[in-house]
Regions:
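Bacterial N-terminal signal peptides that target proteins for export
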Residues: 2-16
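Proline-anchored loop/turn motifs at beta-strand termini and strand-loop-strand connectors
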Residues: 40-63
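Bacterial signal peptide processing site
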Residues: 29-31
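C-terminal motif of bacterial Sec signal peptides marking the signal peptidase cleavage site
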Residues: 24-27
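Surface-exposed amphipathic alpha-helical segments
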Residues: 51-53, 134, 188-222
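Soluble non-cytosolic domains of exported or imported proteins
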Residues: 42, 123-127, 200, 204-208
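Short aromatic-glycine motifs in intrinsically disordered, low-complexity regions
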Residues: 33-46, 133-137, 207
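Conserved polar/disulfide-associated segments of primarily extracytoplasmic proteins
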Residues: 58-182, 192
């Protein structure tokens, strides 16, 4: 199974903490970067300053329109969420869709877990937060196009989880690359999810900036 070690420099985390102290959600910083944070849980993320934000409010409004089973309960459990893209044309609907995007979409979501979810959570359930990745990996279910690029355990001060990157899609359609980092808090009460995705070609063209975003993701904890 392909594996790619994910490393983070402590100096980057210290820089983020220093820049973000005193703000719950921040979108300011150096000439080249902006910072998103959720201070109550010590969650930080650095992105290019020029990227456009899809706000928590717009995401909540979009999610409230879902009629899927359990959608209302999942939405109610969200503590905070925000999304970004270099394109101002990306909407909240695009964020929640699994359809291909020609522009990178970065989505950060923090939500509480129910008692039932806490008892059932596992590394495989963390992998399956967006698509049934664990079954694609073990072959119990298949998809026409699937390549696992990375699948590594992640340890943060505030929790632990798994980072995965993979390419998937229908046989005759454009494939997309999805990178996800899913962290379970130390008390097993909260899930921190960072998802980055776009078409395979788009991801290859933007991999340097997306790699930096993924490396900046920090869950410091309460």
């Amino acid at each position: 199974m392909p594996s790619q070690k994910r490393s983070k420099k402590s100096s980057l985390k210290l820089l983020l903490l220093a820049l973000l102290v005193g703000s719950s959600v921040v979108a300011c910083g150096t000439p080249s970067q902006r910072y998103a944070s959720y201070k109550p849980d010590g969650v930080f993320l650095a992105l290019p300053k020029t990227w456009h934000e899809i706000s928590t409010e717009k995401l909540a409004q979009q999610e409230a329109q879902s009629t899927a089973v359990g959608a209302a309960e999942r939405a109610a459990a969200v503590k905070w969420q925000v999304a970004y893209s270099p394109s101002s044309q990306i909407t909240a609907a695009d964020v929640f869709s699994i359809k291909n995007s020609e522009q990178p979409i970065v989505f950060l979501r923090i939500r509480s877990l129910s008692n039932v979810e806490r008892n059932l959570v596992s590394f495989n359930s963390l992998r399956d937060v967006i698509v049934p990745l664990s079954s694609w990996i073990d072959g119990s279910s298949t998809i026409p196009r699937f390549t696992l690029l990375a699948d590594d355990e992640v340890t943060e001060k505030g929790g632990s989880g798994v980072h995965s990157r993979f390419v998937f899609g229908p046989a005759e359609a454009t494939a997309q690359t999805l990178d996800q980092t899913v962290v379970l808090s130390n008390d097993r009460r909260t899930l921190y999810v960072l998802v980055m995705r776009c078409t395979e070609t788009c991801f290859e063209q933007n991999h340097e900036v997306l790699d930096k975003i993924a490396a900046s993701f920090t869950v410091h904890g309460k």
